[in-house]
Amino acid sequence: MPLSDAPLGHNVAYPSEYNAALLFPIARAENRAGLGLDGALPFDGTDIWNAYELSWLDAKGKPRIAMASFRIPASSPNIIESKSFKLYLNSFNQTRLPNAQTLRDLLEKDLSAAAGAPVDMDFILPQRFDTLRIQELSGINLDKLDVEVDRYEPAPELLGCTGTGIIEETLMSRLLKSNCPVTGQPDWASVQIAYRGRPIDRAGLLKYIISFRQHAEFHEHCVERIFCDLMQACQPEQLTVYARYTRRGGLDINPWRSNAGASAPADLRGARQ
């Protein structure tokens, strides 16, 4: 289905009952073709979604609440358009279910069908809420650098290396901003870049991250673009790119891409999330 058919950017009625057909998948292939990724992917990855506004009715009609974390593999053929995801979750608000496990089973089944691959989830009931914590991304903070910036569309030519030796380091910035390709709404994120290879020029990397400021692309696509541009410019032996975007409509999206053979990171919310 074309993106113009998605609920994003349109006025739509909020559903009054459960409806899995509300989920709107978007193929990853078109964006990846634009990055030259038409064969085996150069990374592993996961899109970590967090749902903060999840509610349903129990068998007696009493509201129940929970939070949930979903992990959609980057190898899946589809992403799920975020407004359709929100509408789908809201369709449970007036739906009676016998127990929380029934809801969990429906979520896993429906989201896996939309993504085209198994979706893992962590179902967080209120008794676990006080175990959740906030933790900022680790790494050397690039935002302290004094740089002059005049590029606000992705400029991979800003990327480069400063030496020939091999190092391992982790860098981070809170200055990633992109925009929804349909509505133009700003998407705010912190991004972490861990690599093994020649030293990446830090000032150039910060200016490159800032250059996304007027760019219109979905969260997942931005992270894959950053990964591919860094691989092309610096050819690190290992590279991991992880972004944590602020929430919208009760959902946040946190794409992670890596060729380091590591497991996906723990889902630790940042202060702005």
UniProtKB/Swiss-Prot annotation:
Residues involved in substrate binding: I80, E81, S82, H219, E220
Superkingdom to which the source organism belongs: Bacteria
Reactions accelerated catalytically: 7-aminomethyl-7-carbaguanine + 2 NADP(+) = 7-cyano-7-deazaguanine + 2 NADPH + 3 H(+)
InterPro entries per record: GTP-CH-I_C/QueF (IPR043133), NADPH_dep_7-cyano-7-deazaG_red (IPR050084), QueF (IPR029500), QueF_N (IPR029139), QueF_type2 (IPR016428)
Active site, per annotation: C180 (thioimide intermediate), D187 (proton donor)
GO MF annotation terms: preQ1 synthase activity
Keyword Magnesium carried by entry: no
Enzyme class: oxidoreductase
Biological or metabolic pathway of the protein: tRNA modification; tRNA-queuosine biosynthesis
Keyword entries, A-Z: Cytoplasm, NADP, Oxidoreductase, Queuosine biosynthesis
Subunit and interaction comment: Homodimer.
Reported function: Catalyzes the NADPH-dependent reduction of 7-cyano-7-deazaguanine (preQ0) to 7-aminomethyl-7-deazaguanine (preQ1).
PANTHER family: NADPH-DEPENDENT 7-CYANO-7-DEAZAGUANINE REDUCTASE
Name the record gives this protein: NADPH-dependent 7-cyano-7-deazaguanine reductase
Organism annotation: Bordetella avium (strain 197N)
Lineage: Bacteria, Pseudomonadati, Pseudomonadota, Betaproteobacteria, Burkholderiales
Gene name, Swiss-Prot/TrEMBL: queF
